Amino acid sequence: KPVYKEKLRLRTYGQCAVDNSPAFLEIKKKFRGITYKRRFELTYKELHNYITDGTPPDKRGQVFEEIDYMIRRMSLKPKIVICYDREAYYGKDDKEFRLTFDGNVRFRRDDLDLRAGDHGEYLITQPYTIMEVKSAGAIPIWLARTLSEKKIFHGSFSKYGNIFANEIRQKYKVGV
């Protein structure tokens, strides 16, 4: 695995973005197993205008400038939309603890405007679900015991990485 990884994500929540929906530009960096995430909030209309014609939002800050520099330096353009149905749970006593379940993961490489809805080709369907556990420290002992009893063990899964790997397999007919 690489020591350093960096990705840019454009994100909205809900089934279909509208012009005044909250939207986020996020930089996610992973260095030696530690993930750092910085995000900038704007409306979907501002995000769409910025991505399509370079018009920056009225309100900017350090995080936006960092993202803007990254986009310009690397000539980044949106390439894929990934949608999923998420259930998220937060710790009652530990606000740093979060448990999420992502199901019905779908994607599309055309029609990249998020106002077009959450349609796409399925990557994962029921009964399969991605479970993610996030915690600033050790996970709660009750969860560790439950996962162990159910023989659920740590693994990694990248939605984008798996879409890309599937496309490569299809292209070269490897393992199909």
Question: At which residue positions do the language-model features occur?
Answer:
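Phosphate-end processing signature that detects enzymes handling 5′-triphosphorylated RNA
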Residues: 1-176
